[in-house]
Amino acid sequence: MRRYDFALTWVNSEQERFVQWLKRECKLRSMDMLVAGPDNIRSAVKDVEEGRLRIKFLLDNEAAYNEPIDIYARFCYAVKDTGGLVVCDPDYARAASNKSITHYDLIRSGIDVPYTIIVRNWQPDTFCLTPEEKKHLGGGFIIKPASGFGQKGIIKSATGSIAEIASARNFNRGDNFLLQEKMAPVTLDDKMAWFRVYYIFGEVIPCWWDTQTGRYAHVTLKEFSAHKLLPLVRIISEIARITRLEFFSSELALVKTVSGARKFVAVDYVNDQPELCVRPAAINGPLEDVTEHIAARCVEYAYRRIGNYPAQYFRQVTLAKLNLVDETI
């Protein structure tokens, strides 16, 4: 039987820096690593199911649990069923990736979310909003599939006509759809107060994220203190508790209420497969320092779990590295 200490599901190039960092970290710990992608995923599934291959730890980046038959989801279950540890656990990820489920979980836990109408997949194409619902949704609201990801199937400036809602649902007739109030974040130091926050094994990594440009910026200690961003940590930690996911990202926005007070709102609830492909600064994308840190953290966690060492699952907030020439504090 072949055995691998660490495996990754990945459909992009293995030359991506995230994959190279994982390989480096595995090599440092003398761990064998398998990348399961388009060329070998089917044979890998068969080998695991038939006892010829054993995976001790799997980091999943590809499973589509909303698809009736998805080979990567099957691989996750095969690894779990043969005693391997899967991050994220396929049963938890399946539930958490459905926004029509997570929406109510967050509300019950006291987390603020946008005003939302959920259209179930069995409702007719003649579904229409009441005047009161249209009023609460406001002009130019969002329509998105409950199990969607990667901005797919989203309408960003909906008006609420019967034809428009029916057309949006054609993206996936078997899915529920969320009609969601559009959030307008406040501005803090010339930055849009919209955050993409990573949660990884108890650790919280907050980043600014511009929804218009896709630009990331790691939150600094000075910003974290000056703008009172500690609620980001509380909210994403509560989402982790609710969903039981160990690694994910969430989008949180700071908005102004009708009364003038500010509050943090969970906008895109859970992404159990965060964006991890580093891109040149001109293109924008996840930050190199953050992504490299995540790679190291994943392998270290796997090493400790499969070696029965203390897993270092602790609460901490990781902020941007200090520039000792131009202090950020």
Would you name each region that the model predicts?
Residues 10-124:
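Conserved N-proximal alpha/beta basic substrate-recognition cap immediately N-terminal to
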